[in-house]
Amino acid sequence: MPILANLSFAPTQPTGWLSYSLNLLKELKNLDIDVLSPIEISGIKCHHSPPDMTTDFGMKGHFKRLLWTQFQLPNLYRQMKSTLLFCPIPEAPLFSSCSYVVTVHDLIPLRFPQWFSITQRLYCSYYIRAVIQQSKHVICDSMATAGDLSNFLGVPEEKITAIPLAYDVENFFYLDLPTQNYFLYLGRHNPHKNPERLITAFAGLSNCKDYELWLAGPSDRRYTPVLKAQVEKLGITHQVKFLDYIPYSELPKIINQAIALVFPSLWEGFGLPVLEAMACGTPVITSNLSSLPEVAGDAAILINPYNTAEITEAMQAIATQNQLRSRLSSQGITHSQQFSWEKTGKATVEVLSRYI
């Protein structure tokens, strides 16, 4: 009797959710598994879900997908004679007898409600809570998220398994390229990602004009104009580059040539850019909060993300100390090798196998 994996959210462009799902499916190949997906997945038997309800279609697609999940997915589950539904994001049918295991990547709207709409907060507080309550088990990416599940939603510890993510070893590795004088940030411009303090910290470098700050991530009409106005006010327009979305194939080169990745997020469910940068041998400066110390270990400079002076000090150290850069590069490569999709897959199989 097969497991049914629901990838009905899968967009055409790579995202963290999609990367998690696709890499995990490769490791679940020994299970009897069917996949619902709007896109073709190499080497995986897929049953097509409607293409107009993926994350490419924003809120409209999300609303369609939620209705489809409640009223159509249970029928497919029965038709395929599935014994377990695996949901790589926290979306599942509430009004059916489907047995399911769900992955929750973070609960950031509950941790920072001031930066999210009432709709997003209610979605987490009620829909995701209900999905979790009806699930057989909850997988999450880190002990930090496991703590949030218990603290915010009251999920019993015995119902949660934290399984670390991994990175794409075929795409992220050390390239023998000359380092260029830019600090790199990878991520969205949302306030909880902390780009505003990063820009302030960069402006505080004593030799700021010798360096650039590259912000690689999709523009957001709510936040990007504010950041650009801040850059102009600080007089560093020529040194801060807004790169918008970077094609996946181009990321390794950009990461490899950065003097450091600076990732001062206030909260992350995992923080995959930290691991990807380490695999490339690029020094990392990141937050001492949430899951980021779990991911970075002793192979990065950990800073208080609320303290801009501390971020500046770390960037200054990277810019001026060759031995520090060399040590962090070497330690990062070694540390990143502790993470693999094989390990993630094996731990996930152990959880799913309990409920087949």
What does each model-found stretch correspond to?
Residues 1-356:
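Carbohydrate transferase catalytic cores enriched for Leloir-type hexosyltransferases
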